[in-house]
Amino acid sequence: MLNLFRQSGLRFLWLAVVVFVIDQVTKHWIVANLEPYQAIQYTSFFNLTHVYNYGAAFSFLSDAGGWQRWLFTGIAIAVCGLVTWWLKETTRQQVMLPVAFCLIIGGALGNVFDRLLHGFVIDFLVLYYQDWYWPAFNVADSAICLGAFLLVIDMFKNKDNVNE
């Protein structure tokens, strides 16, 4: 078992733990220091705003009546299981792919924890330009997006290696 851990992408699981902890610490700080919907402007394009997201990305299905909490929790847990299995299948030589998987796992578990504990996800990072606002997000969402981006990069990197 230890050999499998050392020889596969499972050796990067610490990154998922780091993402989860940073996500939860930042959310705890927001809850402790900002009232719901209170904003602190830092620049002309960025602020911290304490908001609750009852839906998925971009508040998808946020007003669906509560059942979506369990749907999104179930999907996230299933995805984490699948991605962990894929992580186990990676080789020692692969780095970008297991890092991407662990970013996704850590972010997904951070949001699952919120859904189970609160019934919603705490978002607080807001980017905007004049009257155009990107939907609020959090560290977990950022890790998931970065992981997905790295998956795409890895896919094209491996495509180039196969064609040579």
Curated annotation (Swiss-Prot):
Transmembrane annotation, as ranges: 12-32, 70-90, 93-113, 133-153
NCBIfam families in alphabetical order: lspA (TIGR00077)
Enzyme nomenclature, EC number: 3.4.23.36
Primary gene name: lspA
PANTHER family given in the database record: LIPOPROTEIN SIGNAL PEPTIDASE (PTHR33695:SF1)
Pathway(s) of this molecule: Protein modification; lipoprotein biosynthesis (signal peptide cleavage)
Keyword Membrane included in the entry's annotation: yes
GO molecular function: aspartic-type endopeptidase activity
Record protein name field: Lipoprotein signal peptidase
Function noted in UniProt: This protein specifically catalyzes the removal of signal peptides from prolipoproteins.
